[in-house]
Every structure is written in C-alpha cells, then in structure tokens.
C-alpha cells in the first residue's frame, strides 16, 4: 500500500504528506489468469530470499507447512510483509509452488489489479521499476477497503482515506477528475457491497 502510494507520487510528480504512510509492504499477484514472466525452470524460495535480508522477518506459517502470505518482525509489530491476490469464489489461498509461497486472497483486490502501470521506487542504493495499480483505481480501492477494516485497524483505515484523498485531489487539481470518476463509477457499478463500502470511504 504505502510503497505503491509513494511510487505513484513519483510517477505523478507529487510529494505526499508524511501522515499517509504505514510500514506494510504488499506484493500482489493478479491470480491464476496471469502468468509471471519467469523462465519455466526457475525456482525461488521466497522465505530464503527474505531471510537473507536479515530484517528479522518471520513467516506466519500455514498448516500445510508452506511459508504463509504474511511475514512479521517480532521486534517491530508495525513492519509487515503481505503477499496477496484476488479472492475467488473458492476463497482458498493461491499456492505458488515455484516460490514456496501462499498468497492471501483479499476481497476487492481485483479492482486494483485490473489496470496496472509502471512506476519507480527510489532508495539510497538506486531505483527499481515496479508494477503498480493505476492511481485512480488505487485511490478508489482504498475507499473500498476502508469499509472492510475492523475498528482495531482504525489508524490504518485513516491512512487509507488520506491516501485516497491525496490522489483524488491530484486528479481534481490537474483537470483530470473524469479519470477518477470513471474508476469510481466502475467500482460502484459492481454491486451493492462494492457501492456500500466505497460510499463509507
């Protein structure tokens, strides 16, 4: 979420306010309908790769022994790494054997993954090109998930709203309100549950 938000700011030429960040890092996969552009014989153990970073991230292991969709650092409860995908009718985790990883299916995630773009994440060591949701879809998705968050995640929910408002303000200030409005209409046209949650945000 936050890293995508920051990368969207880079793409749009905007520096966001400080209060819009969380320490979650999310990796999203669009589900079974999209192939990852990797060689067919490539095997990567995500757990080993994360362990090599020496950040203290431990997997929340599933019952089947696979590294779970979430990693946490016991010393820093704010730092969390999530591997997510769209929720299907089966509501089961998507297991990626070549990565030794299970992805957590999330409601409404498909909205962000339907139209993606590329952006850049910068660090002291350089830059990296990443795939991102279209900014308008990212913002509308944040409004939708606001309605899904439990009271225990109210601080995170408020950051969802701040991120959505920041992006919506960008579109309004730059004469592109129609771009945001098209994404909004798409979301609320998907049914009562979508509309109710979006309007809560």
Where in this protein do the model-derived segments appear?
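Compositionally biased terminal segments of proteins
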Residues: 2-201
């Amino acid at each position: 979420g936050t890293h995508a938000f920051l990368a969207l700011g880079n793409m749009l030429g905007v520096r966001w306010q400080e209060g819009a960040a969380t320490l979650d890092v999310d990796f999203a996969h669009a589900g079974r309908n999209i192939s990852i552009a990797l060689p067919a014989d490539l095997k990567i153990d995500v757990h080993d790769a994360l362990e090599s970073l020496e950040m203290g991230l431990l997997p929340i292991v599933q019952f089947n022994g696979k590294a779970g969709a979430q990693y946490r650092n016991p010393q820093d409860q704010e730092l969390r790494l999530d591997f997510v995908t769209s929720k299907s009718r089966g509501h089961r985790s998507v297991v990626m054997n070549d990565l030794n990883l299970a992805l957590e299916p999330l409601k409404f995630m498909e909205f962000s993954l339907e139209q993606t773009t590329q952006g850049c994440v910068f660090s002291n060591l350089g830059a990296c090109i990443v795939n991102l949701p279209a900014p308008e879809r990212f913002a509308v998705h944040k409004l939708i998930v606001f309605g899904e968050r439990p009271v225990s995640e109210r601080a995170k929910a408020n950051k969802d709203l701040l991120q959505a408002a920041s992006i919506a303000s960008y579109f309004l200030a730059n004469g592109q309100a129609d771009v945001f409005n098209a994404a909004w209409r798409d979301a609320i046209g998907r049914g009562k549950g979508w509309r109710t949650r979006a309007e809560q945000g």
